[in-house]
C-alpha cells in the first residue's frame, strides 16, 4: 500500500515556510503501522498541481494533500482536484451557515472570499476541522482515497490523527517494519558503515542518518531473527562502546538528562558561545529542576569578570576551567560545565573559528576538552552543545 503527500504552497518552495507537515505525517503514520511512500511539493499554480496530483493518483492508494483550501485567491486545491477528476464543486449550505455564525459571534461580517471554504467536491465526505474553518475533504475515487486537508500544522495534524489514521486502519493492513535506533557520536558515517558491514547479518535493514556530529543507525527489528539481532547489537557494543550515545532515538540532551537523574547528580552550567542553548534544552524536560541547579550565560568579557570577581585569562582553556570551578563553588552542584568558543563568521578573538573549550568539574578534579568544529555559525553552536553533552556523559561514566 502506497501513501503519498502532495504539499501545495509557493512559500514552501521559496523557503519562507518550513514543511513541518511532512515530518509530522511521516512520524504519525509510522507510529500507527504505515509508511509514507513519497512526497511532492508544488507551487500555487493550477497546472502544476493538477499534473503532479494525477501522477500520484496513478501510483498510490492514498493521496493526502495539504494547503490551498483557504479563503484567498491562491487557494484552489479543491478546484484543481475537481477538474482533474471531472467532479462538480458544490456549496455546503450547512457549513456556510456555521462559518457565518462564527464571524457573527465575534461581531464581524464574514468576507465573501471565505465562501469558497464551504465548497465541497461532488460525492465527498466532510472531515471536521476542530482548529479552523476550512473542513477537510475525503474522496473515494476508483478505490483510491484522497484526503484534501488544510496547510496550517495545527489544523493538519489533528485531522491526520482523528480522521486519516482511523480510516487507514479500517481499510489497510499495517506494515511489519519495526524500527529502532542506535546513536553514535564522534564517528565518520562512511567509516562507521564500513566497519559495521564486517559483521552485519544478511537481510538486516539498516540506514544511516547523520546530523550535527551524531549518527543515527536505524534498523528494522523484524528484518532478521531475534537471535541474530541480539548478536548484532552485542557486536555493536563490543566494537563501538566508546562511541555509542544511546540505544534510543532521543536528543543527546535527553540522554544526558536521563543519566544525571539515574546517578542522582546535579549540574550547573556556564555558557558563552552557546548562549544558553544547552541549559534551554535541559529545561525542556519535566523534572529539570531536580537536575539543573543553575545556568549562567556570560557572553561578554565584563560578565565573565563579574562572575569570577577577578580579571580573566586570555587563555580560554584556563578561563573555561576557572568558570567551571567557580560555578560548582557558587551553586553547590555535583558537577559544573563551562563552554567557550569562537562561532564566527568573523573572529572576535585570537582563536580560529570553530575552536571550542569545555571544562567539567566535580569538586575532585577538573577536566578540559578542546574541539575544532566546522560549519556555519549556527552549525558550530549546535555542534558545541552536542560536544558539551557528549563530554559530560563520558565524564560521568
What residue ranges belong to the model's regions?
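Short alpha-helical segments enriched in small residues
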Residues: 46, 226-397
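Short beta-strand elements in bilobed, periplasmic/extracellular small-molecule ligand-binding domains
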Residues: 29-42, 290-294, 367
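Flexible gly/pro-rich beta->alpha loop and the following alpha-helix that scaffold active-site loops
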Residues: 66-91, 236, 240-247
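Proline/glycine-rich low-complexity loops and linkers
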Residues: 48-51, 58, 75-171, 313-315
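Glycine-rich phosphate/diphosphate-binding loop of Rossmann-like nucleotide-binding domains
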Residues: 1-39
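Accessory alpha-helical/coil subdomains and C-terminal extensions
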Residues: 140-213, 218-223, 228-229, 246
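Conserved hydrophobic helix-helix packing surfaces used for dimerization/oligomerization
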Residues: 3-5, 146, 267
Amino acid at each position: 500500500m502506497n501513501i503519498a503527500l502532495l504539499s501545495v504552497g509557493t512559500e514552501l518552495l521559496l523557503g519562507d515556510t518550513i514543511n513541518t507537515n511532512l515530518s509530522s505525517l511521516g512520524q504519525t503514520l509510522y507510529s500507527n503501522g504505515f509508511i509514507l511512500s513519497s512526497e511532492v511539493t508544488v507551487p500555487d499554480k493550477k497546472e502544476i498541481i493538477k499534473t503532479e496530483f494525477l501522477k500520484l493518483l496513478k501510483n498510490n492508494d492514498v493521496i493526502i494533500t495539504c494547503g490551498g483550501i483557504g479563503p484567498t485567491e491562491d487557494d484552489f486545491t479543491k478546484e484543481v482536484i475537481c477538474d482533474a477528476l471531472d467532479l462538480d464543486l458544490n456549496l455546503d449550505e450547512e457549513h456556510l451557515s456555521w462559518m457565518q455564525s462564527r464571524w457573527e459571534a465575534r461581531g464581524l461580517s464574514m468576507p465573501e472570499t471565505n465562501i469558497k471554504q464551504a465548497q465541497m467536491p461532488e460525492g465527498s465526505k466532510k472531515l471536521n476541522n476542530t482548529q479552523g474553518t476550512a473542513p477537510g475533504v475525503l474522496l473515494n475515487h476508483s478505490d483510491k482515497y484522497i484526503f484534501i486537508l488544510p496547510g496550517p500544522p495545527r489544523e493538519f495534524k489533528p485531522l491526520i490523527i482523528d480522521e486519516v489514521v482511523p480510516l487507514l486502519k479500517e481499510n489497510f493492513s499495517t506494515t511489519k517494519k519495526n524500527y529502532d535506533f542506535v546513536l553514535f557520536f564522534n564517528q565518520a558515517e562512511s567509516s562507521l558503515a564500513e566497519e559495521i558491514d564486517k559483521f552485519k547479518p544478511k537481510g538486516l535493514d539498516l540506514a544511516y542518518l547523520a546530523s550535527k556530529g551524531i549518527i543515527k543507525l536505524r534498523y528494522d527489528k523484524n528484518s532478521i531473527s531475534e537471535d541474530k539481532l541480539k548478536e548484532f547489537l552485542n557486536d555493536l557494543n563490543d566494537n563501538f562502546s566508546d562511541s555509542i550515545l544511546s540505544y534510543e532515538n532521543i536528543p543527546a540532551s535527553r540522554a544526558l538528562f536521563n543519566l544525571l537523574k539515574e546517578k542522582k547528580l546535579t549540574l550547573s552550567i556556564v555558557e558563552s558561545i552557546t548562549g544558553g542553548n544547552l541549559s534551554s534544552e535541559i529545561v525542556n524536560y519535566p523534572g529539570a529542576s531536580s537536575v539543573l541547579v543553575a545556568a549562567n550565560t556570560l557572553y561578554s568579557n565584563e560578565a565573565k569578570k563579574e562572575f569570577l570577581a577577578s580579571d580573566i585569562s586570555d587563555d580560554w582553556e584556563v578561563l573555561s576551567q576557572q568558570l567551571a570551578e567557580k560555578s560548582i563553588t557558587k551553586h553547590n552542584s555535583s558537577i559544573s560545565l563551562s563552554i567557550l568558543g569562537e562561532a564566527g563568521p568573523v573572529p572576535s578573538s585570537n582563536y580560529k573559528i570553530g575552536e571550542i573549550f569545555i571544562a567539567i568539574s566535580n569538586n575532585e578534579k577538573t577536566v578540559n576538552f578542546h574541539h575544532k568544529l566546522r560549519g556555519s555559525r549556527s552549525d558550530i553552536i549546535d555542534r558545541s552543545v552536542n560536544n558539551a553533552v557528549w563530554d559530560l556523559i563520558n565524564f560521568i561514566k
